[in-house]
């Protein structure tokens, strides 16, 4: 997916005369030059205590867009920058500013859209821990620490809430 976002592999549905209009909406930290390194940097600086499993989700890719007609209207009214700023603001508020490692506006495809990359780091007790309160065995409770958990960030209830909130926030 990074190859598509960074245009190291050019999809057939792009217009090469508009590729120069694509732009990064989030700057990488110093010493970081691409999305893969930005994800690694976030994982290394998040203060995670647990080992990251080899099959564990380390990043979530999100595409933000509208219908072709809606996006043409936004672009035609000169409100594309405002639309981008509203979406980046929503992403930061929803997933955390530190967890949003990349956002790129693609203008070289038929419909303008944003590709965002989020590292799913959450704080607080595990959802499973809440269920274990009624269990027979009690384990020592640990202080809440940052943890990598895509299941919590992308639960069904969260996805419904995100759809409602992003529509309200970005119109």
Language model feature labels by segment:
Residues 1-171:
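N-terminal nicking endonuclease/strand-transfer module with a His-rich metal-binding environment
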């Amino acid at each position: 997916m990074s190859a598509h976002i960074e245009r190291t592999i050019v999809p057939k549905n792009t217009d090469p005369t508009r590729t120069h209009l694509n732009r990064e909406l989030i700057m990488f930290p110093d010493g970081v030059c691409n999305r893969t390194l930005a994800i690694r940097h976030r994982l290394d600086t998040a203060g995670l205590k647990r080992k990251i499993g080899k099959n564990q989700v380390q990043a979530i890719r999100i595409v933000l867009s509208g219908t072709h007609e809606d996006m043409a209207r936004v672009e035609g009214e000169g409100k594309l920058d405002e639309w981008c700023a509203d979406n980046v603001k929503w992403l930061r508020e929803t997933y955390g500013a530190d967890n949003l490692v990349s956002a790129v506006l693609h203008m070289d495809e038929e419909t303008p859209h944003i590709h965002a990359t989020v590292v799913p780091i959450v704080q607080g007790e595990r959802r499973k821990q809440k269920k274990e309160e009624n269990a027979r065995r009690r384990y020592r409770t640990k202080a809440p620490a940052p943890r990598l958990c895509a299941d919590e960030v992308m639960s069904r209830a969260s996805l419904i809430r995100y759809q409602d909130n992003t529509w309200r926030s970005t119109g």
